[in-house]
């Protein structure tokens, strides 16, 4: 939108609508809630209505809201590439083909607004999600929806980073700025595999996205191994940001002091709200999804 010759910057929140194949198959290694609920009875209709209610609540607050539609499931093309069909697939493969996890919009893409990029356009890179089989075939459907939603010269939509470099999208990316319109600092959080669970975001993928988007004010931060081992399979399970506020657990980052120092140097206005372990343990933070929330600017 243009106001006085200038582009108006609007923050848009996207949610994914759960599909009818929603089920609890326990497919997500490192996601303790997924493992705990494996085999449970899913209620796709109730879940979809909950999601719609949440989106309506955002709209009632005056926020701009978008939606990702459910993808076609089972993914017959993915099964065909593995030499089978839904009727003949082993139960494990069929469960992966039926997954409705594309609803998790935080894993759809990494977004760099125009104020942060060299060419002055908003860049979006669809996440490849290669670490988990049930999510590795989502990107084609997500990319098609991104290209439809952002079919405007003000936006540049990119395909996925190639395997084997894992990219999990916005769940491992944060942006902080004095205001949404101002140039910001983009924070790419990556993991290092070595514990009981895989690190899903690779630093190679994070740096590639930053280069492709033309982002120069970027900080690459390692997620703490302790957080990953405790079940923080994405950074957004232990940290969340909006505008100038960073809300994070004390044990979210491997070198929080260095990260906070670099962040304050680039963005003196930043407000860091850190929750100490003495107040909320990592276990409680992950089980409650305290940080896996949405911060908005009203």
Name each region found by the language model.
Residues 1-298:
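Histidine/cysteine-enriched polar flanking segments
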């Amino acid at each position: 939108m243009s106001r006085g010759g200038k582009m108006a910057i609007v923050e848009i929140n996207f949610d994914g609508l759960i599909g009818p194949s929603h089920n609890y198959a326990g497919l997500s290694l490192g996601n303790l809630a997924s493992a705990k609920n494996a085999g449970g009875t899913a209620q796709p209709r109730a879940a979809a209505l909950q999601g719609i209610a949440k989106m309506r609540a955002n709209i009632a607050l005056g926020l701009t809201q978008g939606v990702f539609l459910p993808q076609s499931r089972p993914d017959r093309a993915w099964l065909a590439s593995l030499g089978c069909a839904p009727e003949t697939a082993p139960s494990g493969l069929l469960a992966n083909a039926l997954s409705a996890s594309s609803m998790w919009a935080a894993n759809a893409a990494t977004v760099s607004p125009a104020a942060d990029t060299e060419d002055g356009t908003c860049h979006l890179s669809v996440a490849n999600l290669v670490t988990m089989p049930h999510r590795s075939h989502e990107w084609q459907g997500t990319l098609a929806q991104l290209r439809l939603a952002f079919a405007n010269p003000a936006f540049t939509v990119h395909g996925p980073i190639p395997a084997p470099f894992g990219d999990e999208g916005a769940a491992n990316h944060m942006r902080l700025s004095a205001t949404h319109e101002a140039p910001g600092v983009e924070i790419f959080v990556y993991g290092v595999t070595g514990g009981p669970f895989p690190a899903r975001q690779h630093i190679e993928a994070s740096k590639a996205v930053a280069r492709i988007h033309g982002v120069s004010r970027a900080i690459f931060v390692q997620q703490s191994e302790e957080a990953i081992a405790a079940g923080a399979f994405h950074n957004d399970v232990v940290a969340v940001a909006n505008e100038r506020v960073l809300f994070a657990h004390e044990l979210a980052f491997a070198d929080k002091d260095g990260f906070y120092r670099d962040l304050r140097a680039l963005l003196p206005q930043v407000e860091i709200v850190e929750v100490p372990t003495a107040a909320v343990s990592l276990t409680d933070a992950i089980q409650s999804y305290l940080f896996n929330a949405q911060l908005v600017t009203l």
